[in-house]
């Protein structure tokens, strides 16, 4: 990840675009959180306890409750700006991906995330289960697992507490790591080794 970010920050220095800087800092936040938490999430899934999707969904539910949001009414994609301006901005650091494809990805992300919200008592999930039943129960379950459900689908309190502690660990790292990115947007330099992971750690 690190070498690619250095090139992206050079692009920010050249263009002096605040929107591009905001995107890169957001990308950095995503990287810090995932590279810290995914090793544990993947370990739990590999042990057959709880799937990656289900654990993250229940963690989302917990965080929504903690921050005063209703998991059955909250739309996580509300902050995504699916505009051509956003797509052109992202294209500056991902030049191999066409602006149109980035725009479509943003639109589809927003649409599908809204579909997964349980604002209808689970009706969309049930309809999806029925529509996907010809594909087999296992494949249908893989897709419908993404839908938020009215109630928690599994008792994973121990795993959620561990994930919460890992998120706190990521939050502690974030200020220094994001400062590294911000400095690169002003002058050339190098990122520390902690940027040399993948999103899976």
Q: Which residues does each PLM region occupy?
A:
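Single conserved hydrophobic/aromatic residue that forms the stacking wall/gate
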Residues: 1-7, 11-12
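Inter-helical turn/loop segments and adjacent helix faces that build the functional surface
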Residues: 15-16, 43-47, 69-107
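Active-site beta-strand/loop microenvironment that shapes enzyme catalytic pockets
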Residues: 16-54
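Short alpha-helix boundary/capping elements
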Residues: 29-36, 67, 116, 120
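Charged/polar positions within long, soluble alpha-helices
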Residues: 34-42, 64, 179, 183-186
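Post-HExxH zinc-binding segment in Zn-dependent metallohydrolases
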Residues: 48-74
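An amphipathic alpha-helical core segment
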Residues: 92-164
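Acidic, carboxylate-rich catalytic segments that either coordinate divalent cations
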Residues: 137-201
């Amino acid at each position: 990840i690190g070498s690619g970010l250095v090139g992206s920050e050079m692009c920010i220095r050249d263009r002096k675009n605040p929107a591009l800087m905001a995107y890169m800092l957001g990308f950095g936040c995503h990287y810090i959180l995932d590279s810290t938490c995914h090793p544990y999430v993947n370990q739990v899934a590999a042990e057959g306890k709880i799937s990656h999707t289900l654990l993250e969904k229940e963690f989302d539910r917990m965080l929504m409750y903690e921050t005063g949001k209703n998991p059955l009414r909250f739309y996580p994609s509300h902050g995504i700006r699916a505009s051509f301006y956003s797509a052109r901005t992202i294209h500056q650091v991902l030049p191999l991906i066409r602006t149109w494809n980035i725009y479509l990805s943003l639109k589809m992300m927003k649409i599908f995330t809204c579909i997964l919200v349980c604002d209808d008592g689970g009706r969309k999930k049930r309809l999806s289960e029925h529509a996907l039943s010809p594909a087999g129960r296992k494949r249908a379950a893989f897709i419908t697992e993404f839908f938020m459900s009215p109630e928690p689908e599994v008792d994973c309190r121990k795993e959620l507490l561990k994930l919460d502690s890992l998120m706190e660990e990521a939050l502690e790292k974030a200020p220094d790591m994001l400062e590294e990115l911000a400095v690169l947007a002003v002058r050339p330099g190098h990122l520390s080794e902690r940027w040399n992971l993948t999103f899976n750690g």
